[in-house]
Amino acid sequence: MFTGSIVAIVTPMDEKGNVCRASLKKLIDYHVASGTSAIVSVGTTGESATLNHDEHADVVMMTLELADGRIPVIAGTGANATAEAISLTQRFNDSGIVGCLTVTPYYNRPSQEGLYQHFKAIAEHTDLPQILYNVPSRTGCDLLPETVGRLAKVKNIIGIKEATGNLTRVNQIKELVSDDFVLLSGDDASALDFMQLGGHGVISVTANVAARDMAQMCKLAAEGHFAEARVINQRLMPLHNKLFVEPNPIPVKWACKELGLVATDTLRLPMTPITDSGRETVRAALKHAGLL
């Protein structure tokens, strides 16, 4: 369940900015039918930054309910205060989620020792499997391989989403962790190369709109059929890149609407609607991928 194509799912909203249950069900059904390995609910792409904690928990629980055991659900539970992250994580004890994706603290930029103590404290307050999430371009701090190696010794820290796009990290981390520690890419554009170096899969934005292709690409890569996987990846490459032509999740939410997967592309401020130029750029990438 922690391998292959795991979607960082968008949080669909109605025109008033309320979570749209019907669209969420449609998305989940789409991922079940497409072979997506698991769903990350309320991560960065799911607009965790603009949901309060009650809404955050409600969306995760709604996702679990609608998934109905058909696909594993992982909850995004990070915060930049350790006590807050512990509290949010503990909301999902015994809920049915299979694990938590926990981002490094953002804005306050802790030291490596601070990062170690932060993640260790969270893990010690829950039995839920913990996946570390390193995305320094967003958080302002970088979880270094040596710290990952230390954290991998904590019993329920089972993997990392490594979203630097720096492929040297794969081998650096592999040298410091056990073979069963899960290495997931957080960068669609380099995910196939990441897997070829020994990674286990990707937590994907692209999978929101190209779920079947991403699942197939990861399956081929896991089986060692990298030439075939690369054919799919080359077709998706403009999409990997152009889904970030404007801040995530603006482009991917619009793309979901364009493909009829959600009813609206409504976002909450400070996220704003996609621009005309962004729309045309993403539409061209969808066509290149064979999705339009």
Swiss-Prot record:
Disulphides: none
Domain of life according to the entry: Bacteria
Positions bearing the site annotation: Part of a proton relay during catalysis: 44, 107
Recorded GO CC terms: cytosol
InterPro entries: Aldolase_TIM, DapA, DapA-like, Schiff_base-form_aldolases_AS, Schiff_base-form_aldolases_CS
Database matches in Gene3D superfamilies: Aldolase class I
A Pfam family hit: DHDPS
Keywords: Amino-acid biosynthesis, Cytoplasm, Diaminopimelate biosynthesis, Lyase, Lysine biosynthesis, Schiff base
UniProt binding sites for pyruvate: 45, 203
Residue ranges of the TM segments: none
Known EC number: 4.3.3.7
Subunit structure as annotated in this protein's UniProt entry: Homotetramer; dimer of dimers.
Family: Belongs to the DapA family.
Name of the protein: 4-hydroxy-tetrahydrodipicolinate synthase
